[in-house]
Amino acid sequence: MLKSFSKKLFPALAIALIAAPLLGQKPRPASTLRQKPFPSATRGAIEEALGRKGTPSPGGVLRFGFPRGDLQVVKSGITIRPALALGSWVAFQRIGDHAMVMGDLVLLESEVESVMASLQENGVEQTALHNHLLGESPHVMYMHVHAIGNPARIAKAIRTALEFTETPLAASPSAPAAASVDLDTAAIARTIGVHGKVAGGVYQLSVARREKILIEKHEVPPAMGVATGINFQPTGAGKAAITGDFVLIGREVNPVLWELTQAGIQVTAIHSHMIDEQPRLYFMHFWAIDDALKLARGLRAALDRTASKK
């Protein structure tokens, strides 16, 4: 009887095992797929709507910067360069025929209401509105945005919202990037553990996290705003003003805060930038003016308390 049962059972099991992937298996989430760049026509439509060229980044991301060169913001006696803390940006990630868009708009208080209303009317969500710095003059707010849909329409919506600000929107001629700043960038890079780049008179470093970040099952690459950002603006004699934000999960928040404060680095904000991301992320903003290498060591100690790529 067992032999007869086996003859019936094993063919049935074989059919079930073969059919399961075909009938019951869910499609792989986008987080496991390598995202491709936008087709040239789509990229052109995005760039035309925003009025400038984008910068391609890994993960099918096209990123745009809108430096607030119109603002003269001073903190602790330092005039903040746009590349240090005053750069609006938006990033477009290809999701099939659509795009996921994330960004951060640098706004004066007087600009917030009009920009928010414009974005809402055109289908772009706000996921956070807050400070990044403390004690700067004039006071600056940061509005984080998110949308999924037709990339050209989203680009037009963002451009329309920016027209309610004094943000310079005309595409400026490409200027050669500064080859160096008055800092020992090689020593800073060795200390932090990653190489940076010079942009707008500021030495910028980015440190990605080790785990995947997901929104609606889509993997969010570091260029979409989920990497720790560290910026050094030279102030003379080997010193620098630093600011940026650590991207953290909950259990990392207080250990990182401890390391920063022990290094004389002020924590200026702790908050979220997104909604419904996995894992839940917290962003810790910081500020200090001191010897650049001393600050780099403090930042490295804080990074060591995180699951960041080394």
Specify the residue positions occupied by each region the protein language model found.
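Intrinsic, low-complexity N-terminal interaction/targeting segments
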Residues: 75-91, 129, 211-236, 270
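Second-shell loop/turn segments in exported
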Residues: 30-34, 100-109, 143-148, 174-175, ...
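Bacterial N-terminal signal peptides
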Residues: 11-21
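Extended intrinsically disordered, low-complexity coil regions enriched in Ser, Thr, Gly, Ala
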Residues: 81-83, 109-135, 222-225, 250-275
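Bacterial N-terminal signal peptides that target proteins for export
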Residues: 1-12
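Intrinsic disorder/low-complexity detector
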Residues: 26-67, 71-75, 163-208, 212-217, ...
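Hydrophobic, ordered structural segments
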Residues: 107-127, 137-178, 288-309
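A conserved regulatory-domain signal marking ACT and ACT-like small-molecule sensing domains
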Residues: 88-91, 133, 141-148, 221, ...
